[in-house]
């Protein structure tokens, strides 16, 4: 029953059914001034899908007389889709879109996420991609606002480094962006972290774009962020304090909850 509920973690705004916003931004002073985040603004067919994502969540928790009515889209653009989790139906398309893109990757995968606690299938997909020669880079905050999540994510770093994945720790501020690009053509921007809560429990909404120009811009942003990050190398990681290893091991049982 718990998996059928889900927290609403989406960050969407739709104005007059003409323009829509989606991404990682919360509303608050700290988020606006102190955090590094990514949101997208959409016009056109994708706005309808963002509105539907809002109405699905609204209708799931309101009675018939209070529900938003469904209306068909005027048109559609196959380059842009909205993947929206629906926990009551156990529908989690964001996770599937990530897996599909990672498994198709031939050249590079660039992921930015504030909390990296993947399930086994997502982790193995990334490891396998790196082992077959794909340039896999994962950027996370050096110190996020959730210390337990930080320590839990570090428990994956050893396997990732061994497989050849580049791990970047962003130092300039708390980076809260949830983005990915694959092979310079596929991109996603949204509210979903690469963790089990976002990919298999929460209400989340991600915009998925298959467009080279958009992906090029996302890669430029990733490169700029990388200039403010430090790369973890294997010798440095293997030389970490023994207490850190103990904490990482103790948090393994909590991974399904994070």
Outline where the language-model segments fall:
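Charged, low-complexity intrinsically disordered terminal segments
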Residues: 1-258
């Amino acid at each position: 029953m718990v998996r059928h509920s889900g927290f609403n973690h989406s960050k969407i705004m739709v104005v007059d059914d003409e323009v829509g916003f989606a991404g990682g931004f919360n509303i608050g002073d700290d988020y606006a001034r102190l955090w590094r985040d990514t949101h997208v603004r959409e016009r056109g067919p994708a706005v309808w899908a963002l509105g539907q994502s809002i109405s699905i969540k609204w209708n799931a928790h309101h009675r018939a007389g209070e529900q938003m009515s469904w209306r068909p889209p005027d048109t559609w653009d196959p380059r842009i889709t909205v993947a929206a989790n629906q926990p009551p139906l156990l529908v989690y398309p964001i996770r599937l879109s990530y897996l599909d893109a990672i498994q198709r990757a031939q050249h590079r995968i660039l992921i930015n996420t504030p909390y990296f606690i993947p399930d086994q299938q997502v982790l193995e997909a990334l490891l396998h991609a790196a082992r077959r020669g794909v340039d896999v880079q994962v950027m996370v905050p050096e110190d996020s606002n959730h210390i337990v999540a930080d320590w839990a994510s570090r428990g994956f770093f050893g396997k990732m480094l061994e497989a050849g994945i580049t791990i970047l720790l962003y130092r300039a501020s708390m980076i809260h962006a949830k983005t990915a690009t694959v092979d310079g053509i596929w991109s996603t921007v949204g509210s979903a972290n690469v963790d089990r809560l976002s990919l298999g429990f929460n209400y989340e909404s991600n915009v998925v774009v298959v467009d080279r120009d958009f992906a090029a811009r996302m890669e430029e942003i990733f490169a700029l962020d990388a200039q403010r990050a430090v790369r973890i190398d294997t010798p440095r990681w293997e030389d970490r304090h023994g207490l850190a290893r103990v904490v990482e091991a103790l948090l393994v049982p909590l991974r399904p909850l994070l």
